UniProtKB/Swiss-Prot annotation:
GO terms for molecular function: purine nucleobase transmembrane transporter activity; purine nucleoside transmembrane transporter activity. Keywords: Membrane, Transmembrane, Transmembrane helix, Transport. One of its GO terms (cellular component) is membrane. Its main location: membrane. SUPFAM superfamilies: Multidrug resistance efflux transporter EmrE. InterPro entries: PUP_plant. Signal peptide: none annotated. This is Purine permease 3. It is found in: Membrane. One of its GO terms (biological process) is purine nucleobase transport. Belongs to the purine permeases (TC 2.A.7.14) family. The chain crosses the membrane at residues 4-24, 35-55, 72-92, 108-128, 132-152, 168-188, 207-227, 249-269, 274-294, 304-324. May be involved in transport of purine derivatives during pollen germination and tube elongation.
Length: 351
């Protein structure tokens, strides 16, 4: 069951992680200028979470005895408060990321976000006491080096219509977004550990629902202050792809981004925050390739090398996990054999 959850969450995360930045950049490339609106779209798809929650509720209700009450939500106040806090932080982090995408090519933004893995490793070590293995360290180093290699000659990717100041500002703000999200992932894992209730995937979905609701509220407040509600009808009419496609892009953006967040927190539940971070980093070079295909961004040799290093890091990490699992099973078998031998030898010694 755990392996199935890991695979499902990896697929969902891959769709969101690769598709989210591309469709967000599509909005900005075709006349979109509202950063808070783009921020809102990152979490606005949260109502789709009610669908699996409804199935979970129906299943629990059928399994209960007749007359027993079944609550739709399982989350308790302690985990609820944690979800609210993480949701507010995510709202501001999403704004930082949207600001960066507004002024940077997808390839450059992907490179910066890849650097968050090093920060995730540090925060995970201090916040959730995540132990490092040689394979984990090797994966972190390879993925970080891959991100650094990807950074070579990024200045040539600067959009023509943007100033150097806008480019640098977008670069620095995206770095801040990477660091902040690197803090959020272990914070979610810590919330799971301190929940004082048995974590299930239903609880993970409820946590995600509240997180996205609060992040969306932060975005709506930002949209109101920035005047986005007044500006959006005009922006839709002037959208280069047409008014109808403006709303299509908005809807698909909300749905695809929801996949990213669901996959990320689902991996934290079934594995750890570090694994979630490694998976995000592995997918970034794939986003690079898609950006080259759809937006005709340059694919220098550095990007090819970065892709190879990232895949190497991915393989290194999972090989280490497989080896670690085999070692644990071997130790458990040896301990069980020793226990059996000691129990058999005890009557002889007593005689």
């Amino acid at each position: 069951m755990v392996k199935a959850l890991v695979i499902i969450n990896c697929i969902i995360l891959a769709i969101g992680n690769c598709g989210g930045p591309l469709i967000m950049r599509l909005y900005f490339n075709n006349g979109g200028k509202r950063i808070w609106f783009s921020t809102f779209l990152e979490t606005a798809g949260f109502p789709v979470i009610f669908i699996p929650l409804l199935f979970s509720y129906i299943t629990r209700r059928r399994s209960n005895n007749v007359g027993d009450s079944t609550s739709f939500f399982l989350i308790k106040p302690r985990l609820l408060i944690a979800a609210v806090i993480v949701g507010i932080l995510s709202g501001f982090d999403n704004y930082l990321y949207a600001y960066g995408i507004a002024y940077l090519p997808v390839s450059t933004a992907a490179l910066i976000i890849a650097s968050q893995l090093a920060f995730i490793a540090i925060f995970s070590f201090f916040m959730v006491k995540h132990k490092f293995t040689p394979f984990t360290i090797n994966a972190v180093v390879l993925l970080t080096v891959g991100a650094a290699v990807l950074g070579m000659h990024t200045e040539t990717d600067k959009p023509v219509h943007e100033t150097h100041k806008q480019y640098i500002t977008g670069f620095l703000i995206t770095v801040a977004a990477a660091v902040m999200y690197a803090f959020i992932l272990p914070l979610v894992e810590l919330a799971y550990q301190k929940a004082k209730q048995t974590m299930s995937y239903t609880l993970v979905l409820e946590f995600q629902l509240i997180l996205c609701l609060l992040a969306s509220i932060v975005s709506v407040i930002g949209m109101f202050i920035a005047g986005d509600f007044k500006a959006l009808p005009k922006e839709a009419r002037e959208f280069k792809l047409g008014e109808a496609l403006f709303y299509v892009v908005a809807v698909f953006s909300a749905i695809i981004w929801q996949g990213f967040f669901l996959g990320a927190i689902g991996l934290i539940f079934s594995t750890s925050s570090l694994v979630s971070g490694i998976m995000i980093s592995v997918l970034l070079p794939i986003t690079e390739v898609l950006a080259v295909i759809f937006y005709h961004e340059k694919f220098q040799a550095e990007k090819g090398l970065s892709l190879a290093l990232s895949l190497w890091g991915f393989v290194s990490y999972f090989y280490g996990e497989i080896k670690s699992g085999e070692d644990k099973r071997r130790i458990q078998q040896e301990e069980s054999q020793e226990t059996e031998q000691s129990s058999l030898s005890r009557p002889i010694s007593e005689c």
